[in-house]
């Protein structure tokens, strides 16, 4: 009897999963057809429904970015391209498209370049997604085991040397991959960057309307959120300027 119950439960679960897959594919087909026929709002609605029901992924954010770009909703396009790059920093098309969208925005702020080694390290980190770094770490760890096996279980000097240096190189590369997998994960979880969604907003010296007006920024600008307080966000621009603006005018990447 127990076997029949288990089989029945398995059948129900498989049927449920197949139903989800079919429903998701139907929505993807709807979104693609709507995009091809220039019905961009319908495309957006379909992708948003997929995100709500089935979760998000880089391709979904990229397609949403394209639909918003076609609508000339550049802040939303930038937001979704940035979200795509957060999960898949190696997506070249998203990198190009987000720069095209930024050209349509008002603010053109010169960024302060970080130290060269920070840029270099971040570039390495963004070469792969977190999962890819993790897979590479596993591969190098397996090569480390093979190298150790070669060193300990062979008697020829040349092979022992090859095994030793292979194991040494593999464990170093494994640790590097683990480091960048962690760095990429922290980068995703930190979520301290946001896109300005308000057409124009005055940035103030304190979290209150009575604060001194420092400067004005516009929709589509990417900022770093340093802290929040009572409906206000302390933001930092890429040129180092800092101030407070209403949190409702921001959408976190």
Sequence positions of predicted segments:
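Internal/C-terminal transmembrane anchor helices
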Residues: 160-184
